[in-house]
Amino acid sequence: MNQQELKQAVAQAAVDYILPKLESDTILGIGTGSTAALFIDALAQHKGLFQGAVSSSEASARQLEGHGIPVYDLNEVDRLVAYVDGADEANARLQLIKGGGAALTREKIVTACADEFVCIADESKWVPVLGKFPLPVEVIPMARSFVARELVKMGGSPEHRHGCTTDNGNHILDVHGLEIHQPAELESAINQIPGVVTNGLFALRPADVLLLGTNDGVKTLYPHS
């Protein structure tokens, strides 16, 4: 299978995984990106089985609404049964790099509110060590240059993602050249830099389950310590 077919297979597997959890009052958290978009399309076939969704981006919200799935503001919701989203990289502990679509802050917030984080990805995203994919860092615009200098001190090579403004009105620095052997520690350290909103490491709150699309079928993986 090509990459698109792998993504479609894992999106359908995610729907199959979620279906037993759905009740009439269930609200799901739904992420952003190409694999999440395929999940939304597949989930729409079952929109009568649950109440609605909270989206981590304006783009996903528009897609959900286009399918007739009610979209709620997170402040209106007490509980999310699950959050389903893709990843740019994943390791054996199900620690992730996310944010290629610039929605990392909202993704991290919605993840924190969910009972379960279900990550969906194709096998090209499975890595032994995080960092080959540039690590996105969302920054307040006035702090961009300062944060970039601090990231250089940490061993990275930050690059301003020109033409990209997040849904929150901020900028993205993509940090190249990192081999991230201690993801949780680096996530915390970067978030301590004044001007950083958050970064794309999901290590302090990793995925609970990873549905990984491979040529041998979709594998269901859990964190390995």
Curated annotation (Swiss-Prot):
Gene3D superfamilies: 3.30.70.260, 3.40.50.1360. Substrate binds at residues 32-35, 85-88, 98-101, 125. One of its GO terms (cellular component) is cytosol. It catalyses: aldehydo-D-ribose 5-phosphate = D-ribulose 5-phosphate. The keyword Isomerase applies. Keywords: Isomerase. This is Ribose-5-phosphate isomerase A. Pathway: Carbohydrate degradation; pentose phosphate pathway; D-ribose 5-phosphate from D-ribulose 5-phosphate (non-oxidative stage): step 1/1. Homodimer. It comes from Teredinibacter turnerae (strain ATCC 39867 / T7901). Pfam families: Rib_5-P_isom_A (PF06026). One of its GO terms (biological process) is pentose-phosphate shunt, non-oxidative branch. The active site is at residue 107. Catalyzes the reversible conversion of ribose-5-phosphate to ribulose 5-phosphate. SUPFAM superfamilies: D-ribose-5-phosphate isomerase (RpiA), lid domain, NagB/RpiA/CoA transferase-like. CDD domains: RPI_A (cd01398). The keyword Isomerase applies. Belongs to the ribose 5-phosphate isomerase family. One of its GO terms (molecular function) is ribose-5-phosphate isomerase activity. Its EC number is 5.3.1.6. It is an enzyme of class 5 (isomerase).
